[in-house]
Amino acid sequence: MKIQPTLRIAFAGVFLLFVNACATTAPTAPGPLVGTWTNSLGAVWTMKADGTFNVVNPKRHIWGTYTVAGDTVTIQETGGKTAKGCKGPGAYKFRRTSENSLTFTLVSDTCKERIKNVTLAWHRK
Protein backbone atom coordinates (compact mmCIF):
# COMPACT_ATOMS: atom_id res chain seq x y z
CA MET A 1 0.00 0.00 0.00
CA LYS A 2 2.60 2.58 -1.07
CA ILE A 3 -0.08 4.60 -2.83
CA GLN A 4 -1.69 5.93 0.36
CA PRO A 5 1.41 7.75 1.77
CA THR A 6 2.17 9.11 -1.71
CA LEU A 7 -1.38 10.44 -2.05
CA ARG A 8 -1.17 12.12 1.35
CA ILE A 9 2.04 13.88 0.36
CA ALA A 10 0.56 14.91 -2.99
CA PHE A 11 -2.61 16.29 -1.36
CA ALA A 12 -0.55 18.16 1.24
CA GLY A 13 1.56 19.70 -1.54
CA VAL A 14 -1.50 20.77 -3.54
CA PHE A 15 -3.07 22.21 -0.40
CA LEU A 16 0.05 24.26 0.39
CA LEU A 17 0.21 25.55 -3.19
CA PHE A 18 -3.45 26.57 -3.01
CA VAL A 19 -3.01 28.40 0.30
CA ASN A 20 0.09 30.19 -1.00
CA ALA A 21 -1.69 31.26 -4.21
CA CYS A 22 -4.59 32.71 -2.23
CA ALA A 23 -2.25 34.67 0.01
CA THR A 24 -0.22 36.21 -2.81
CA THR A 25 -2.98 37.24 -5.22
CA ALA A 26 -5.46 38.93 -2.92
CA PRO A 27 -5.88 42.61 -3.83
CA THR A 28 -5.37 45.28 -1.22
CA ALA A 29 -8.35 47.29 -0.05
CA PRO A 30 -8.45 50.81 -1.49
CA GLY A 31 -8.31 52.29 2.03
CA PRO A 32 -5.00 54.19 1.72
CA LEU A 33 -6.35 56.22 -1.21
CA VAL A 34 -9.89 56.91 -0.03
CA GLY A 35 -10.59 60.60 0.48
CA THR A 36 -10.58 63.92 -1.32
CA TRP A 37 -7.20 65.09 -2.58
CA THR A 38 -5.98 68.25 -4.32
CA ASN A 39 -2.82 69.16 -6.25
CA SER A 40 -1.03 72.36 -7.31
CA LEU A 41 -2.93 72.53 -10.62
CA GLY A 42 -6.21 72.88 -8.74
CA ALA A 43 -7.48 69.38 -9.50
CA VAL A 44 -9.73 67.82 -6.86
CA TRP A 45 -9.66 64.01 -6.87
CA THR A 46 -12.22 62.14 -4.79
CA MET A 47 -11.51 58.42 -4.37
CA LYS A 48 -14.30 56.37 -2.82
CA ALA A 49 -14.10 53.09 -0.89
CA ASP A 50 -16.20 51.34 -3.57
CA GLY A 51 -13.36 51.70 -6.12
CA THR A 52 -14.79 54.69 -7.99
CA PHE A 53 -13.30 58.15 -8.40
CA ASN A 54 -14.22 61.63 -9.57
CA VAL A 55 -11.78 64.33 -10.75
CA VAL A 56 -12.69 67.98 -11.22
CA ASN A 57 -10.09 70.44 -12.47
CA PRO A 58 -10.27 73.75 -14.34
CA LYS A 59 -10.37 71.94 -17.74
CA ARG A 60 -12.22 68.67 -17.14
CA HIS A 61 -14.66 66.64 -15.08
CA ILE A 62 -13.80 62.93 -15.25
CA TRP A 63 -14.96 59.83 -13.39
CA GLY A 64 -14.09 56.17 -13.42
CA THR A 65 -12.87 53.18 -11.45
CA TYR A 66 -9.65 52.19 -9.76
CA THR A 67 -8.16 49.03 -8.32
CA VAL A 68 -5.35 48.66 -5.82
CA ALA A 69 -2.87 45.77 -5.70
CA GLY A 70 -0.20 46.26 -3.05
CA ASP A 71 1.29 49.71 -3.67
CA THR A 72 0.03 49.99 -7.26
CA VAL A 73 -3.20 51.64 -8.37
CA THR A 74 -4.73 51.17 -11.82
CA ILE A 75 -7.00 53.99 -12.96
CA GLN A 76 -9.64 53.61 -15.69
CA GLU A 77 -11.68 56.61 -16.80
CA THR A 78 -15.26 55.65 -17.68
CA GLY A 79 -16.88 59.02 -18.33
CA GLY A 80 -16.59 62.75 -18.60
CA LYS A 81 -14.47 64.98 -20.80
CA THR A 82 -11.56 62.61 -21.37
CA ALA A 83 -8.45 63.98 -23.09
CA LYS A 84 -7.23 62.48 -26.37
CA GLY A 85 -5.27 59.27 -25.83
CA CYS A 86 -6.70 58.72 -22.34
CA LYS A 87 -9.23 55.95 -22.98
CA GLY A 88 -7.00 53.17 -21.61
CA PRO A 89 -5.92 52.48 -18.04
CA GLY A 90 -2.99 54.05 -16.23
CA ALA A 91 -0.95 52.31 -13.55
CA TYR A 92 0.97 54.11 -10.80
CA LYS A 93 2.83 53.17 -7.64
CA PHE A 94 1.58 55.23 -4.71
CA ARG A 95 3.08 56.26 -1.41
CA ARG A 96 1.55 58.01 1.58
CA THR A 97 4.31 60.36 2.72
CA SER A 98 2.15 61.43 5.68
CA GLU A 99 -1.48 61.13 6.75
CA ASN A 100 -2.38 64.07 4.52
CA SER A 101 0.07 63.62 1.63
CA LEU A 102 0.09 61.22 -1.30
CA THR A 103 2.52 60.76 -4.20
CA PHE A 104 2.38 58.65 -7.36
CA THR A 105 5.13 57.27 -9.60
CA LEU A 106 4.37 56.25 -13.18
CA VAL A 107 4.32 52.51 -13.93
CA SER A 108 2.55 52.65 -17.31
CA ASP A 109 0.17 55.10 -18.98
CA THR A 110 -0.31 56.47 -22.51
CA CYS A 111 -2.22 59.57 -21.36
CA LYS A 112 0.17 62.53 -21.15
CA GLU A 113 -2.35 64.80 -19.42
CA ARG A 114 -3.12 62.19 -16.76
CA ILE A 115 0.60 61.57 -16.15
CA LYS A 116 1.17 65.32 -15.69
CA ASN A 117 -1.67 65.55 -13.16
CA VAL A 118 -1.30 62.28 -11.25
CA THR A 119 2.46 62.52 -10.68
CA LEU A 120 2.14 65.84 -8.81
CA ALA A 121 2.04 65.83 -5.00
CA TRP A 122 -1.49 65.43 -3.60
CA HIS A 123 -2.75 66.75 -0.27
CA ARG A 124 -5.86 65.77 1.65
CA LYS A 125 -8.56 68.38 1.25
Language-model-derived ranges and their functions:
Residues 10-20:
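Bacterial N-terminal signal peptides
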Residues 20-125:
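Lipid interaction determinants
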Residues 2-11:
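Bacterial N-terminal signal peptides that target proteins for export
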